[in-house]
Amino acid sequence: MGILARDGCELTPRAEEAEVLVVNTCSFIEAAQKESVDAILEMAEHKKFGAAKKLIVAGCLVERYREQILEQVPEVDAVVGTGEVERILEAVHGDLRMLPAEPPTFLYHDFTPRMVTTPKHTAYIKIAEGCDHPCTFCIIPELRGKFRSRRFESVVREAENLAAAGAREITLIGQDTTSYGEDLGLRDGLAQLLAKLAQVRDLLWVRFLYAYPNRITQELLDTIAAHPRLANYIDMPLQHASRKVLARMKRGANGDAFLDLLERMRKTIPGVSLRTSFIVGFPGETEADFRELCDFVKAAKLDWMGVFEYSDVDHAKSYALDEKVDAETIADRRDRLMALQKRISKESLRAKYRRVKNETFLALVEGPSKENPMVWEARLEGMAPEIDGKLYLTDIELPGGDVAEAGDAVRVEITKSEAYDLIGRAVEILPRPAERAVANVPFIAAVPAEGKPHRIATGAPLRVLG
């Protein structure tokens, strides 16, 4: 979207207004693939009966089904794969039907035009692209290519620019953030990067997601513990705890090894919040394997957890494995595991944030709740944006009359804990950073908190649905 906006396109969320429709697709799992296909067909109808003159399909689905998309949906005018992102303008302005396929080697940098689709106080930075791990359930290497890290200085510059534009929190992402820098010859590259980002002024927290268990080093843990701006938070997808299932996944390790790692994390970083995700119903997973996973979850006492139902992806190696688990059993196991974690998360929140007289916690204010505008949402250090629980503030006005705003850092008292969320009230608003000029950024545009893009009025005649 940033490339299009810099070129003078006016972005709109309304398909009926657009002259060019761009569908960015995902095909990582079956559900995402179906959603992408549905979106393409819906936009094809808009093109037939609306103002749109062109329909472009971009993203992961193109990497797998480039020719099929063009053959089966004649309304599609061009396809742009993950290796051709910077050629989106050729697709928009040209009359070519298919760009020549290129290997997925694209890696954006701090000068790449970018539209920030989060509220300005929180932002994501992708520090790497692709993956070299051989997980049998995953097709990321096919879709995104080999692992490649962004240059150290490029990531730091982007963080500095986002902070100058009002970001109080940076979340680092990548298919495997903990491998950052290995291809650049950096030892403990993520630890080095975090230490540098911890010096960026005006940031409240820096966190990272998608850590790979065997890449968690003691140096990384020590770095998190040493810098107050580095959130005491680690997201580490484990996928399972049964040695047999993990071996079939080509993940390695086992539940006991994971428990040892979790103990080391908690010892090094007191109060650390831990998140993971699991896959249930992987081919060959027996009831005994599932019970082993449940026993692990009970012992691990993780703060947050996501559970995914296994689904076959035709290009994944697991597609050819025998002993498939039926859909009903998979859904039942997901429900049972989530019910177990719900009790654990509730106990974890209660223990970490139990009501203690005069004790306060640092929180980042998000804004009014969608469910109830009279209540405001915030997050604590141990809550990552979009995926974890929330802190609901029943009162954002202080006795002196000051009122907290979205993006404010506040001290809060916790009054109640629920299964995944907390309730509290603001008692102090921390000083707000002074506004600063943003340098060396070709395009940064914020969109509303609900995540829908603004129509960007540039005076250009072309409207693009993003």
Residue map of PLM features:
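Flexible glycine/acidic-rich beta-alpha junction loops that bind and position SAM and/or redox cofactors
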Residues: 66, 174-184, 216-219, 238-250, ...
